[in-house]
């Protein structure tokens, strides 16, 4: 046997031992985990949640299985985390910032506006989470909330668009003159801090409010979810660059007692599948949003605009000011933000410069596509 074949054989054997059901796994008790989502099971986030579940099932030889339940199946949406804590359901699925009422630091994990005011995007936030102390702080978050939860960060679903408008906005003065639906909580409050007439309302209420003239503009998410909501029917001016939810993360909450009863192999399988889900989600959403945006522009006549540059400075500065206030009031919030600041001071100067070439390359290609004549029918 030559050296290359010997090395390949050893590598294959090691991989088999790492992931094949061993004696301990074969003897493990079967566990069924019910996951109640806070959103309908038709949502893209649930599609990727089911992929995560499938990966865990395959890695554990189906000794761990899942049932994904729609919002409200067992308890009301707002009670999801408490229900998992008490063991009424084994797991829940939402965005971390849903629970900022229990602890403001949840915002720094689920939806830090303007990347915590530090310029973090989805990729750099995941870098902080995996390699700069973020995961340990995430685990501590549940202890700070005093809930019996083991959390798994699964899905970076941002960046979200600034939003839609009935008429173009060319300056912050224009923006301040529009009644604009924003996310609830801290991101929406920061809009108010910079003078925007921010209105918080549920997703199902947005389109009727636009049709009745109650709103002049709105944000929800990104091209595909926005398309599903039908915003293109009443608004044609779309601004993709926004800061209120440039980083948005969805995660899984597992009851702590259920977690402790899993074997080490089963626990590792969940951790491996969760890490894989981070990249798979980014890849999936780039493709889905790209397809939706193409349809919005070519079929629905939606016009894309660049967000006024003054917006970025004003929103970022207001975010930092708000976060300094929370830091003064809450030691754990400060601990998390200080960790993100230390990471950003090192990583963001590199990452921001490196992304310029990607942005220029993408813009150049988009410009080429725009010059091509439309295909004949």
Regions found by a protein language model. Give the residues of each.
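Twin-arginine (Tat) signal peptide motif
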Residues: 1-10
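Sec/Tat signal peptide C-region and signal peptidase I cleavage site
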Residues: 5, 19-26
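N-terminal secretory/targeting leader peptides
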Residues: 11, 27-125, 143-377
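Divalent-metal coordination cores built from histidine and acidic residues
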Residues: 124-127, 138
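Hinge/lid segment of periplasmic solute-binding proteins
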Residues: 131-146
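Bacterial N-terminal signal peptides
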Residues: 9-18
């Amino acid at each position: 046997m030559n050296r290359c074949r010997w090395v390949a054989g050893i590598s294959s054997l090691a991989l088999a031992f790492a992931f094949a059901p061993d004696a301990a796994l074969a003897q493990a008790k079967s566990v069924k985990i019910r996951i109640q989502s806070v959103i309908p099971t038709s949502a893209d986030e649930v599609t990727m949640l089911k992929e995560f579940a499938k990966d865990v099932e395959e890695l554990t030889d189906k000794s761990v299985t899942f049932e994904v339940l729609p919002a409200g199946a067992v308890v009301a949406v707002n009670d999801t985390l408490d229900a998992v804590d008490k063991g009424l359901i084994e797991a829940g699925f939402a965005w971390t910032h849903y629970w900022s009422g229990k602890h403001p630091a949840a915002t720094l994990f689920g939806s830090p506006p303007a990347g915590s005011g530090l310029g973090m995007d989805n990729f750099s936030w995941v870098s902080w989470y995996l390699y700069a102390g973020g995961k340990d702080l995430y685990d501590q978050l549940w202890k700070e909330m005093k809930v019996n939860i083991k959390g798994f960060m699964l899905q970076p679903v941002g960046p979200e668009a600034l939003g839609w408008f009935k008429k173009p906005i060319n300056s912050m003065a224009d923006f301040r003159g529009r009644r604009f639906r924003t996310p609830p909580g801290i991101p929406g409050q920061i809009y108010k801090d910079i003078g925007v007439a921010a209105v918080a309302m549920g997703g199902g209420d947005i389109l009727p409010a636009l049709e009745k003239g109650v709103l002049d503009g709105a944000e929800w998410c990104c091209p595909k979810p926005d398309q599903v909501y039908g915003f293109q029917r009443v608004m044609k001016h779309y601004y993709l660059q926004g800061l209120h939810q440039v980083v948005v993360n969805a995660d899984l909450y597992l009851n702590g007692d259920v977690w402790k009863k899993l074997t080490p192999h089963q626990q590792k399988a969940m951790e491996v599948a969760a890490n894989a889900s981070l990249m798979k989600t980014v890849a999936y959403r780039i493709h889905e949003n790209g397809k939706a945006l193409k349809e919005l522009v070519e079929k629905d006549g939606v016009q894309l605009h660049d967000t006024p540059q003054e917006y970025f400075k004003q929103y970022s500065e207001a975010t930092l000011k708000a976060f300094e206030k929370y830091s003064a009031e809450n030691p754990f919030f400060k601990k998390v933000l200080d960790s993100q600041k230390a990471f950003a001071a090192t990583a963001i100067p590199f990452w921001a410069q490196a992304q310029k070439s990607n942005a220029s390359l993408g813009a150049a290609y988009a410009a080429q596509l725009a010059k091509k004549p439309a295909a004949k029918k």
